A protein has these predicted regions:
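Secreted/extracellular ectodomain signature
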Residues: 1-155
């Protein structure tokens, strides 16, 4: 490999061994993701990366799973269809997250939008992507899920 001034983030070029000290394998997974705002890993929302990661784990474990992602506050726009997204974000590009959301839904993740967030932004049911459910409000829904035995992950 030739020396360069550019940083190389291609992890596959690193030949360092990695020993997992605490291997995890679960038979059942019940997770509720609370997503009030987007934090990014590069250009990918961290919550999407984490949802992909746990879905990969669930598949590897062949685990029984319920994964629910509740979008609210400053992240509700992730659940919008192209027209509503364009209006909300003052862009003409459409929702850049729709394919990621659709892929995760196909893998079993349930997406919900906070009803209180929708009301504040004047979004109706016709404004969300297909398959998105609208709950009463995020706090009530997350409380319900925790009381039902879900582990709450705060993004």
């Amino acid at each position: 490999m030739q020396p360069t001034n550019e940083r190389n983030f291609d992890m596959s070029t690193l030949e360092k061994p990695l020993h997992i000290d605490i291997p995890v394998k679960l038979a059942e997974v019940k997770i509720a993701f609370s997503v009030p705002a987007l934090a990014f890993e590069g250009d990918l929302p961290a919550c999407v990366f984490h949802l992909q990661l746990i879905e990969n784990d669930i598949a590897d474990w062949n685990a029984k799973a319920q994964v629910i992602a509740v979008f609210h506050t400053n992240a509700g726009h992730v659940t919008l269809n192209n027209n509503a997204y364009n209006t909300e974000r003052n862009v003409a590009t459409g929702n850049p997250y729709k394919v990621l959301v659709s892929d995760l839904m196909k893998r079993g993740v349930h997406f919900e939008l906070c009803g209180a967030t929708a009301k504040v932004h004047n979004w109706g049911n016709e404004d969300v992507l297909p398959g998105i459910k609208i709950n009463t409000d995020a706090i009530a829904r997350l409380t319900q899920l925790v009381q039902e035995g879900f582990v709450k992950i705060s993004e």
